[in-house]
């Protein structure tokens, strides 16, 4: 992979260079010493992966991540001196589109890089995701639902760590997946379009922005795209609303899940992925109470085990699954649903 380094500390840059050099398949494309320079470099020479520090002069790592996802979306890994001490900034950057976060590597005795440091494992993981990027071709049309019937709806909520989890989930779904998918990811509207474009590159299904008045369609993935709440109306169409005003997250997973319970007339499946806090737990519980199947991501595969943990704690999940098993479960559930309707 071609990797861009964004860090203003020479010692940290050298540690990153030497760690990357342990993998002959990777090379340093450029080094930026602040966020503004990183944005310009990403536009002029798009890398496969950016290693982004958080605290830098001019533009910090969070703002740079936002700008990159707006102007030239690419994979971004937060690499900072102490992830734990900068947790709030890390979560903000992951909400802006960064895939994951890891501590800056240190050099061993004699200035050598340690191959066991977590950075290499993170780079390898992202490299595997990039290797599965789908060609830009029109996906096959999903098999039509029976006349007059709504397609199954898969409602997905995610927050910190969501971009990586969503990429891994979507790439496992076939191009003829006969369900509609709506995603509520905690992102600012400024870079939602970039995230949709990013996800589209790893999905056999088209990923688009959810538009006011649109209707979820089989074989299509829609992403909430404003700082208002996405919800279903009584007519089954999508709309955005400022209410409720007091929610800590915008868009809110809970608001969308509750609207599925109230207004979706067909089958539905709720999925709550990695994320900080509790958003989505009550909505997932409401979906399960209504009779819909619900899934929460497990702790071992969650970047931040907050939202799915809250859901599991209140019995909101029909199943708690590792990320790699969720797509297969969705395929199985949708197939069973179609067989019942024949």
Curated annotation (Swiss-Prot):
Listed InterPro entries: CheB-like, CheB_C, CheY-like_superfamily, Sig_transdc_resp-reg_Me-estase, Sig_transdc_resp-reg_receiver
Active-site feature positions: 159, 186, 279
Residue numbers of 4-aspartylphosphate PTMs: 53
Gene3D superfamilies according to UniProt: 3.40.50.2300, Methylesterase CheB, C-terminal domain (3.40.50.180)
Disulphides: none
Domain CheB-type methylesterase stretches: 144-337
Recorded GO MF terms: phosphorelay response regulator activity; protein-glutamate methylesterase activity; protein-glutamine glutaminase activity
Enzyme type, top EC level: hydrolase
Catalytic reaction annotation: [protein]-L-glutamate 5-O-methyl ester + H2O = L-glutamyl-[protein] + methanol + H(+); L-glutaminyl-[protein] + H2O = L-glutamyl-[protein] + NH4(+)
PTMs per UniProt: Phosphorylated by CheA. Phosphorylation of the N-terminal regulatory domain activates the methylesterase activity.
Enzyme Commission identifier(s): 3.1.1.61, 3.5.1.44
GO biological process terms held by the UniProt record: chemotaxis
Pfam hit, one: CheB_methylest
Domain of life of the native organism: Bacteria
Matching HAMAP family: CheB_chemtxs
NCBIfam families: PRK12555.1 (NF009206)
PANTHER family linked to this entry: PROTEIN-GLUTAMATE METHYLESTERASE/PROTEIN-GLUTAMINE GLUTAMINASE, PROTEIN-GLUTAMATE METHYLESTERASE_PROTEIN-GLUTAMINE GLUTAMINASE
Function in brief: Involved in chemotaxis. Part of a chemotaxis signal transduction system that modulates chemotaxis in response to various stimuli. Catalyzes the demethylation of specific methylglutamate residues introduced into the chemoreceptors (methyl-accepting chemotaxis proteins or MCP) by CheR. Also mediates the irreversible deamidation of specific glutamine residues to glutamic acid.
Note on domains (UniProt): Contains a C-terminal catalytic domain, and an N-terminal region which modulates catalytic activity.
Name the UniProt record assigns to this protein: Protein-glutamate methylesterase/protein-glutamine glutaminase 4
Organism per entry: Burkholderia thailandensis (strain ATCC 700388 / DSM 13276 / CCUG 48851 / CIP 106301 / E264)
Gene that encodes the chain: cheB4
């Amino acid at each position: 992979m071609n990797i861009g380094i964004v860090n203003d500390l020479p010692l940290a840059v050298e540690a990153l260079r030497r760690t990357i050099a342990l993998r002959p398949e990777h090379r340093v494309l450029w080094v930026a010493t602040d966020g503004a320079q990183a944005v310009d470099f990403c536009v002029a020479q798009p890398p496969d992966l950016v290693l982004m520090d958080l605290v830098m002069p001019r533009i910090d790592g969070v703002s740079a991540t936002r700008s990159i996802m707006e102007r030239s979306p690419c994979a971004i890994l937060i690499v900072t001196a102490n992830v734990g001490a900068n947790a709030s900034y890390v979560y903000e950057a992951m909400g802006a589109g960064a895939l994951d976060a890891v501590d800056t590597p240190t050099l061993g005795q004699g200035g050598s890089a340690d191959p066991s440091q977590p950075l290499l494992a993170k780079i390898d993981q992202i490299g595997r995701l990039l290797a599965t990027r789908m060609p830009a071709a029109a996906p096959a049309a999903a098999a039509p639902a029976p006349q007059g019937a709504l397609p199954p709806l898969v409602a997905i909520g995610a927050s910190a760590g969501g971009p990586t989890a969503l990429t891994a989930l979507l790439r496992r779904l076939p191009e003829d997946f006969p369900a509609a998918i709506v995603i509520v990811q905690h992102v600012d509207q400024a870079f939602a379009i970039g995230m949709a474009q990013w996800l589209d590159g790893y999905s056999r299904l088209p990923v688009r922005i959810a538009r006011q008045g649109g209707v979820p369609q089989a074989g299509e993935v829609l992403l909430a795209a404003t700082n208002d709440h996405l919800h279903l109306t009584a007519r089954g169409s999508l709309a955005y609303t400022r209410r409720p005003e007091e929610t800590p997250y915008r868009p809110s997973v809970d608001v969308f899940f509750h609207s599925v319970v109230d207004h979706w007339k067909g089958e539905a499946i709720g999925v709550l992925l990695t994320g900080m806090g509790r958003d989505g737990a009550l909505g997932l519980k409401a979906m399960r109470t209504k009779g819909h199947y619900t899934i929460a991501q497990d702790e071992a595969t969650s970047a931040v085990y907050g939202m799915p943990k809250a859901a599991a704690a209140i019995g909101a999940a029909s199943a708690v699954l590792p990320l790699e098993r969720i797509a297969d479960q969705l395929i199985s559930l949708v197939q069973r649903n179609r067989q019942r309707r024949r």
